[in-house]
Design a protein with these regions (language model features):
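Electropositive polyanion-binding surfaces
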Residues: 22, 166, 171, 176-178, ...
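Acidic/polar residues at beta-strand termini and the immediately following turn/coil
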Residues: 51, 146, 338, 416-417, ...
Length: 736
């Protein structure tokens, strides 16, 4: 029943709730009490509007839009409205909304289809329930100053302080009833440590994303009740792979081994590849406490010195982990390949393995480079390792020929000592050992995805859609501006055209910067129940099957696969799992996004901490981004900082948004330029680093910026002088 439609069609507006419920009851025969509950729900979600006289109208008919508010620390904000560009909300029109709140907004002025100004009419829901901040004892009251300075200070009563001490970082649960009052209250639920200490600051970031290391008692009880050994009764109806030469290949510090491999040569120069994945679903039963907590977490979160696991260690490091010398339950994909690594056939089975060796990427790399000691140590699997290398190279060539976009971007690696001090930040590239595992897992994921697509069974796919046409055009213009010829198709339909560009810039000094520029033009990969292909891999069918210890989508599709293997009719699977895969896809995409943001912010904090040692020192860097307020420069170790506009030479600059360039009469800055910079400041609270150009004093004469977008010059937008502040780069990742 569509209540909003009934109200509109029968002109039942401006009635109070009792009168409206009675009128609707006469029309529908539904009880007045039930209708009042439904009306209240529609008021709470913003579909209906309750005015000061307690009369009800339809929000959309009044020109009100549902929106999520994003605030800037200066007080103004933006409303994200479906189907419209973001509304600009001036500070005077925020009307009690906080960052992240769901609101009703209305338009107050419209300069163009792209420039809309609005105001908050009503806050529907405050979405911030917990905050992280610094506890300060005052003479008359104790307060917490949130790390997020877009939020107000929080009053903490003595009984709600958990005996926090002055200048300690705390995690606070907000009193939601006080959110619309002049004084927001809360209670301390956890003391995180003394402010400005690395451990407390990292924990503060983790809590700000509502990430918790500990598992609840019910989940732990379930995990601890599971035997750490595989019972012989569990072998039933499983294929026995214990005689295979099975190995795992992981990092030196890894404890959770969820994939293992074995190989043998077959007729006509082909290969039989066995990829064994931990059968986590055998232990994490559907709707158990373990399952619900894994669903909530969605993924394991990895920091340089810490992991927040999706599953308790009793499973992730215990009976689910494919440890050396132990029998383990697996879900296996057996793939027959011809000599060119075309798939001849494959099958998916429940199995049991006994891992012969726990090997590391470093060991595999050294073996491939001819380390005789390691070759002798692993003599029983040496031929297999060479076989994996053959397969990987052939698979890599096949993916290249179909147009896979391969970006070899070095990742910053933060090295810390035992006391948590950051020793160095280095760039690390993926070596051949990593490529072997990557190639085998991609092949496995593709085989599994195609199987269940063809069967038309509900599934969770990993999709990467083609780039937005506007981003493709912008990228093409920027590359041409930097002298990189390209034939990018504006519809973004051919991944091979991207790969040609990447190959053309190989070996150039700005290769990494340009590759990152290409990456930023891409869509974000996500989970969905609809198979939309994977643009980056140039793959028609793709899923995540190979990491069920650390990713919920993998665990869920294991469960679906096992139900199918055990004979559950496809129609039954459709009825049961269609809604489940839809919810899980959305949830897992969100939890992955949260994990990525938390990992990035912790890394940014540690980079800022590390660079405090180098204040005043000179470095050579590459321009990695250009905005009207300044230029971003990336150092050789991957640390990025901002040279603000007032620290550029005095000039009249024109900023071109389409090519991301700042052009002056005498100076010109674009992505890929090499510059010498001085570390001017490293702000650990804001997680940002400021650079200055070597030999350039702060600009006291002023620099004009005439903003240019889509090749249409706009009026001068701002002038930098001694007294004006440049824009913050706090949200640089979202802007660029």
């Amino acid at each position: 029943m569509d209540i909003v439609k009934l109200i509109r069609e029968n002109n039942l507006i401006y009635l109070k709730i009792d009168a409206l419920a009675k009128a609707l009851s006469k029309l529908t025969g539904e009880s007045v009490i039930d209708l009042k509950n439904e009306i209240n729900s529609l008021i709470h979600d913003g579909s209906l509007f309750l005015d000061d006289e307690k009369k009800i109208s339809i929000s959309a008919d009044k020109g009100f839009f549902k929106a999520k508010i994003t605030l800037n620390r200066k007080g103004y904000g933006f409303a994200n409205v479906e189907g419209y560009p973001d509304f600009f909300i001036p500070a005077f029109a925020i009307n009690g909304a906080y960052d992240g709140d769901d609101c009703l907004v209305e338009i107050i002025s419209r300069k163009s289809d792209e420039e809309i100004e609005g105001k908050v009419v009503k806050v529907l829901r405050h979405n911030t329930t917990h905050i992280v901040g610094t506890y300060i004892e005052g003479k008359s009251k104790n307060v917490v100053f949130p790390d997020d300075d877009k939020l107000p200070q929080i009053r903490i009563l003595k009984n709600d302080s958990k005996n926090a001490k002055n200048n300690e970082k705390v995690w606070v649960e907000l009193d939601m009833d006080s959110m619309d009052s002049k004084e927001v209250r809360g209670k301390v639920v956890e003391i995180l440590g003394l402010a400005n200490t690395p451990k407390a600051e990292q924990l503060s970031i983790i809590r700000s994303y509502n990430l918790i290391e500990q598992f609840d008692p019910n989940t732990l009880k379930e995990a601890r009740s599971i035997s750490q050994t595989v019972d012989k009764s569990q072998y039933k109806n499983r294929e026995d792979f214990t005689s295979q030469r099975v190995i795992t290949i992981d990092g030196e510090d890894a404890r959770d081994f969820d994939d293992a491999i074995a190989v043998e040569r077959i007729d006509n120069g082909g290969y039989r590849l066995s990829v064994h994945i931990a059968d986590v679903s055998d232990y994490v039963k559907e709707n158990s406490y373990l399952d619900k907590e894994a669903y909530r977490r969605g993924t394991s979160v990895y920091f340089s010195n810490q992991v927040i696991p999706m599953l308790p260690k009793e499973l992730s490091n215990g009976v689910c982990s494919l440890s050396e010398g132990k029998d383990r339950l697996v879900l296996s994909v057996i793939i027959d390949l011809d000599k060119d690594c075309n798939v001849l056939k494959h099958r998916i089975v429940e199995g049991i393995i006994h891992s012969n060796h726990r090997m590391t990427y470093t060991e595999i790399k050294n073996i491939l480079e001819g380390d005789n000691f390691l070759i002798e140590k692993y003599h029983d699997v040496y031929d297999d390792i060479l076989c994996y290398q053959e397969i990987s190279k052939k698979l890599l060539m096949k993916r290249h020929s179909r147009g896979e976009i391969r970006m070899d971007i070095p990742e910053p690696y933060i090295l810390e000592n035992a006391s948590g001090e950051i020793v160095s930040i280095e760039k690390r590239v993926q070596d051949e050992a990593h490529e072997i595992i990557e190639s085998l897992m991609i092949l496995t994921n593709e085989c599994v995805a195609k199987t269940y697509f063809d069967l038309k069974i509900p599934f969770v796919y990993r999709v990467h859609e083609k780039p937005d046409s506007e981003k493709v055009l912008r990228l093409s213009n920027m590359l041409k501006n930097m002298g990189v010829a390209n034939q990018l198709q504006i519809d973004g339909d051919v991944p091979a055209s991207y790969q040609k560009i990447i190959e053309s810039i190989k070996g150039k000094t700005n290769e990494t910067t340009l590759t990152k520029l290409i990456l930023r033009s891409m869509m974000k990969a996500r989970y969905t129940p609809t198979c939309l292909g994977h643009f980056g891999l140039a793959s028609e069918y793709y899923c995540h099957f190979t990491s069920p210890i650390r990713r919920y989508p993998d665990l869920l599709i294991h469960r679906i696969i096992k139900n199918h293997l055990r004979g559950v009719p496809i129609q039954n699977l459709k009825l049961k799992y269609t809604p489940i895969v839809a919810r899980a896809s959305e949830q897992s995409s969100e939890t992955e996004k949260t994990a990525d943001e938390a990992e990035r912010e912790v890394d940014d904090y540690k980079k800022a901490v590390y660079m405090t040692k180098f204040i005043g020192e000179q470095f050579v860097g590459t321009v990695s981004g250009v905005q009207e307020f300044g230029i971003f420069v990336e150092l050789e170790n991957g640390v990025e900082g901002l040279v603000r506009l007032e620290y550029l030479p005095s000039d009249e600059y024109e900023y071109d948004d389409m090519s991301m360039t700042l052009k002056g009469n005498n100076h010109h800055y674009t992505i890929g330029d090499t510059l010498k910079v001085i570390v001017a400041n490293a702000n650990t609270k804001l997680r940002q680093i400021d650079f200055e150009l070597v030999g350039v004093e702060k600009n006291t004469l002023g620099s004009f910026v005439i903003k240019k977008k889509d090749n249409r010059t706009k009026k001068q937008t701002r002038k930098i002088s001694k007294t004006t502040k440049s824009k913050s780069n706090k949200n640089k990742r979202k802007k660029r």
